[in-house]
Amino acid sequence: VVDAAASSAQLEALDAPARLDWAYRTFGAGLALTTSFGIQSAVLLHMVRELAQRSGVQVPVIWVDTGYLPPETYRYAEQLQELLGFDLRAVQATMSAARMEALHGRLWESGTLEDLELYNRLRKVEPLDRAFQDLGVSCWASGVRGSQTDHRRAMAPLQAVRGLWSLRPLLSWSRKDVFYYMEQHGLPQHPLFEQGYSTVGDWHTSAPDDGTTSGRATRFAGLKQECGIHLPGLMGEGI
């Protein structure tokens, strides 16, 4: 039985690779990694590759392909897969993008939080939860950092979310920590990083930093900073 408070206290003293080692020892085949192939995704993907080399076991990497990612993200995913060779499990919504738009319209254009939450539930949260169930996941690691949003700043290294354990190996990392790790290990940057993006999601809800907004404040037209994957309750917690 995992004690959240005691485990989080133990994890606070560990660096990111050691947190992944702890999770593998604790959850075994129930451990998975989620990735968005965003600006900082290469860091945890590299750490999972290193874990595989130490343990001999491939941790499955779950990628929710919404069907609305920028072309650069799809190409970046191919580049990292070829470079690092992880066990990628790409999942999609049961409802196609065309069907969703026919039934609900272009949900991101209405300017309402309700439509944006419906979009995120259909395209992201439900496919991810289905993948967790299919793979028998009991704990998933993600690249959330405390400095990204107010909600994430209040997170602990390990918390229960929608009946599973959510591990945040990079919770205390800064943008500089991410950049220097990638430089140290020769990891390629996302193509949109050089165009001023500090975070990348779907093409219609991402924008480069413009001097007045930056980070996840550029996402979802400023209506919200979380897609729902990393949130407890009906909308879930996340990628």
Positions of PLM-derived features:
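Nucleotide-activated chemistry modules centered on ATP-dependent adenylation/adenylyltransferase
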Residues: 1-239
